[in-house]
Amino acid sequence: MSRNSGRIGMGIVVGSLAAVGAAVAQREIMRRAGTRLIDWEAVRQIARRRLGEDAVPIPAAQRQQADAFYRETLLRIEPAVAEEIGAQLPRALEVPAVIDRLEWVDLNLATFQQLFARVEEILAQAQSGPDSPGRALSRIVNRSIGNQQLGFLMAFLARKVLGQYDVSLLAAGPATRGRLNFVEQNIVASAAALRVPLDEFRTFIALHEATHAFEFEAYPWLRDHFARLVSESVEQFATDSGGLLGRLRDALAAGPGAKGHWLERIMSPEQLGSFRRTQALMSVLEGYSNHVMHAAGERLLPGFAQLHERFERRNERRGAVERAIMRITGLDLKMEQYLAGERFVKAVIAERDRGFLNRVWESADRLPTLEEIADPARWVARIEGDEH
């Protein structure tokens, strides 16, 4: 055998081994890639690492004491809120849940996971042609980036959220109940930062979340309507991933001085319509809740006005990093909802009365649009016109 033929033989062997190795590597890439957009356990671990010492559980004695306080407080809050809203609950508010920061992460990741499952299903159906190692590798890279981003966001919010009425949108139905969650460690820390008595601050937060519970429990059609809006938005975004990327590039190229919020600029007209309907509903919910909270709070807490002022002043003093995160994630839109919705509620009550305002809860077509929230007289005229 010549030296060249020996080299060729060795080359064939090496090439064969390389081919086998490449095939195994491709299968491993395909296996690891799966079809998931997010690795939920990885997100949880990322959030936990970022929380660090803040991820410690609540001591059992503190949890028990806080749980008893919220139960008793909600019994006092319920009749006061019912009187202000002008509606009775068909059944009592759910038992409150005192949770720690990591428990809050777990609860919200469960909701995200259900939403993403539908997105993954739509994307899998839309994929043309067989899967390939290139596509699989792309999914792995994108999933890793998504894991980091979502883990960061969950850790950030887990330190900020005080109370949350979990409306159970993804299990909407006549028998579905919401859940009142209180992130006790954040409530204790905020009360200390504001230098207010802990029990007063607990009552303040419980009152705000209870008003949201009233809105959904007293008017059950709201949950189904809200769930449809969320489902509609998820379907639209999932079926338009290519167009979304193009609009995102355009939005980034336009820079920070462009008109409107960056989230709105990356939406198609159809997506923007659903988004604006959701924003309008959220605005009314927040504005109405704040109005009721103020009215009931004055009776339940002697120092309510001062406590509310301190709380709002602290919110206005957010640092540059926090403001940037809120803008990037769209959370700043939620803060705008509070203000616009409350102005709408006050204007309608001033022009008519609370009974007239409560017509927003009669059906979905009675809800105001964003344009009507900005100009309450338009909504008043439309509702009165419907009656003639």
List each model region and its residues.
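Pan-zinc metallopeptidase signature
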Residues: 273-388
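Acidic, low-complexity proline/glycine-rich segments
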Residues: 32-46, 164-183, 250-257
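N-terminal mature-domain "stem" immediately C-terminal to a signal peptide or N-terminal signal-anchor/transmembrane
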Residues: 29-84
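Active-site recognition of the HExxH zinc-binding catalytic motif
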Residues: 201-220, 345
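Hydrophobic alpha-helical topogenic segments used for membrane insertion/localization
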Residues: 5-28
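Auxiliary, metal-adjacent structural segments of Zn-dependent hydrolase domains
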Residues: 73-185
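Post-HExxH zinc-binding segment in Zn-dependent metallohydrolases
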Residues: 147, 151-165, 215-301
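Short pre-active-site segment immediately N-terminal to the catalytic Zn-binding motif
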Residues: 187-205
